[in-house]
Amino acid sequence: MDFKWLHTFVTAAKYENFRKTAETLFLSQPTVTVHIKQLEKEISCKLFERKGRQIQLTDEGRAYLPYALRLLDDYENSMAELHRVRQGYSQTLQLAVSPLIADTVLPSVMKRYTAMNTETEMAVTIFESAEIASLIKAGEADIGLSCLKVQSSSLSCHCLYKDPVVLVAPPDKRFIEDNEIDAKEVLEQYLLLTHNHPDYWDDLLRQVRMTFPFVRTMKVTQTHITKRFIKEGLGVSFLPLSTVKRELAEKQMIRIPYQSVQLPYAGAYAIALYENKKEKKFLDFLSHFHF
């Protein structure tokens, strides 16, 4: 059996139209018809019947469809596995990673680890920190890298590093030239961009408002968008230092001293359900990595 026939069949079953099937698969309509006829001959049953310009599955076609989908899925998985083996991989490590960690420390971690462990295929999927623990519990990822600490009897949670939170602002000449920058003046002039980190904002914002009740805020839930807004002069924010190191070095932002309260630290955590050989190896690597 030619798997092209199966692919044509399931696509035709989806659209119930040979013309649309041909366009989707970049085939001619006669080729679609030939594929269906060949499959019908192979399995000795009629899969479609015509209703005017449309087609619809016969009872036999409807019964065969889930098996065709399963055959295609098995075929694609087998080809992916062969491709993985050809590349020299003997195992796969699935990571669920928060956007903030993926955008800061993950590239250097991945570069070092993959160079040292060429037999391990790495798969990285980005999720919000609040989702990661449940994904690990469900077995949808081997290790999670999250900005939220997890307290669970079924999960291990390792602190990777603590990142100081700093107040950053656009590179306004007045603030650059002023040796005694006043956080009060900055917060009076700019919007405070909040909730770009899943952990510290509720407590921090409450403390800021106790000292500066006049502060105007805008909720921006992604760190990279917050940084873009700051560089465009839209506002200021409290961000983990690692996320703005480059911008501070390139003078795209300036750091504002903030002494009204003790600013928090933002944590990064590795979460795992099992610590088998491949998970333990990666966790050991993280524990010795210089963040």
UniProtKB/Swiss-Prot annotation:
It comes from the Bacteria. Residues 18-37 bind DNA. GO terms for cellular component: cytoplasm. Keywords: Cytoplasm, DNA-binding, Repressor, Transcription, Transcription regulation. Its main location: cytoplasm. GO terms for biological process: regulation of DNA-templated transcription. CDD domains: PBP2_LTTR_substrate. Negative regulatory protein for the citA gene for citrate synthase I. Belongs to the LysR transcriptional regulatory family. This is HTH-type transcriptional regulator CitR. It comes from Bacillus subtilis (strain 168). The gene is citR.
